Amino acid sequence: MSVYTIAGRQFQAHQLSLAVLGSVFVGPVIYSKLFKRNKPLSAKDVPPLNAKSKEEEEFILKYIEEHK
Protein backbone atom coordinates (compact mmCIF):
# COMPACT_ATOMS: atom_id res chain seq x y z
CA MET A 1 0.00 0.00 0.00
CA SER A 2 1.40 3.38 -0.95
CA VAL A 3 1.16 6.15 1.59
CA TYR A 4 2.04 9.75 0.73
CA THR A 5 2.74 12.51 3.21
CA ILE A 6 1.33 15.87 2.16
CA ALA A 7 1.48 18.89 4.47
CA GLY A 8 2.22 16.63 7.44
CA ARG A 9 -0.75 14.31 6.86
CA GLN A 10 -0.65 10.84 5.41
CA PHE A 11 -2.88 9.93 2.47
CA GLN A 12 -3.32 6.61 0.74
CA ALA A 13 -3.08 6.35 -3.04
CA HIS A 14 -6.79 5.70 -3.55
CA GLN A 15 -7.67 8.81 -1.53
CA LEU A 16 -5.47 10.96 -3.75
CA SER A 17 -6.90 9.46 -6.93
CA LEU A 18 -10.48 10.06 -5.76
CA ALA A 19 -9.63 13.65 -4.86
CA VAL A 20 -8.11 14.27 -8.30
CA LEU A 21 -11.02 12.67 -10.16
CA GLY A 22 -13.51 14.59 -8.05
CA SER A 23 -11.83 17.91 -8.76
CA VAL A 24 -11.58 17.15 -12.49
CA PHE A 25 -15.26 16.29 -12.90
CA VAL A 26 -16.93 18.45 -10.24
CA GLY A 27 -14.72 21.55 -10.61
CA PRO A 28 -16.03 22.64 -14.04
CA VAL A 29 -19.64 22.13 -12.93
CA ILE A 30 -19.16 24.38 -9.92
CA TYR A 31 -17.30 26.95 -12.04
CA SER A 32 -20.09 27.06 -14.63
CA LYS A 33 -22.71 27.56 -11.90
CA LEU A 34 -20.79 30.38 -10.22
CA PHE A 35 -19.73 32.33 -13.30
CA LYS A 36 -22.77 32.08 -15.53
CA ARG A 37 -23.18 34.69 -18.27
CA ASN A 38 -26.18 36.75 -17.21
CA LYS A 39 -27.09 38.43 -20.46
CA PRO A 40 -26.71 37.34 -24.07
CA LEU A 41 -24.20 39.11 -26.27
CA SER A 42 -25.55 42.04 -28.22
CA ALA A 43 -24.44 43.45 -31.55
CA LYS A 44 -22.24 45.94 -29.68
CA ASP A 45 -20.29 43.09 -28.07
CA VAL A 46 -19.28 41.58 -31.41
CA PRO A 47 -15.75 42.59 -32.45
CA PRO A 48 -15.41 44.60 -35.67
CA LEU A 49 -15.73 42.52 -38.80
CA ASN A 50 -13.11 42.76 -41.52
CA ALA A 51 -15.29 41.45 -44.30
CA LYS A 52 -14.28 42.12 -47.88
CA SER A 53 -17.86 42.37 -49.11
CA LYS A 54 -21.35 43.03 -47.79
CA GLU A 55 -22.34 39.41 -48.48
CA GLU A 56 -19.47 38.10 -46.39
CA GLU A 57 -20.43 40.41 -43.54
CA GLU A 58 -24.05 39.24 -43.68
CA PHE A 59 -22.90 35.61 -43.67
CA ILE A 60 -20.73 36.17 -40.60
CA LEU A 61 -23.49 37.96 -38.71
CA LYS A 62 -25.98 35.23 -39.62
CA TYR A 63 -23.54 32.56 -38.41
CA ILE A 64 -23.02 34.38 -35.11
CA GLU A 65 -26.78 34.70 -34.57
CA GLU A 66 -27.33 30.98 -35.22
CA HIS A 67 -24.52 29.83 -32.93
CA LYS A 68 -25.04 31.93 -29.80
Curated annotation (Swiss-Prot):
GO cellular component terms attached to this protein's record: matrix side of mitochondrial inner membrane; proton-transporting ATP synthase complex
Broad class of the protein's primary localization: mitochondrion
Membrane topology qualifier: Single-pass membrane protein
GO process annotations (BP): proton motive force-driven ATP synthesis; proton motive force-driven mitochondrial ATP synthesis; proton transmembrane transport
TM spans (from-to): 13-35
Domain of life of the native organism: Eukaryota
Keyword tags: ATP synthesis, CF(0), Hydrogen ion transport, Ion transport, Membrane, Mitochondrion, Mitochondrion inner membrane, Transmembrane, Transmembrane helix, Transport
Classification via Pfam families: ATP19
Compartment(s) where it occurs, according to its Swiss-Prot or TrEMBL record: Mitochondrion inner membrane
InterPro entries to which the protein is assigned, alphabetical: ATP19
Subunit details: F-type ATPases have 2 components, CF(1) - the catalytic core - and CF(0) - the membrane proton channel.
Function of the molecule: Mitochondrial membrane ATP synthase (F(1)F(0) ATP synthase or Complex V) produces ATP from ADP in the presence of a proton gradient across the membrane which is generated by electron transport complexes of the respiratory chain. F-type ATPases consist of two structural domains, F(1) - containing the extramembraneous catalytic core and F(0) - containing the membrane proton channel, linked together by a central stalk and a peripheral stalk. During catalysis, ATP synthesis in the catalytic domain of F(1) is coupled via a rotary mechanism of the central stalk subunits to proton translocation.
Family stated for the protein in its record: Belongs to the ATP19 family.
Protein's recorded name: ATP synthase subunit K, mitochondrial
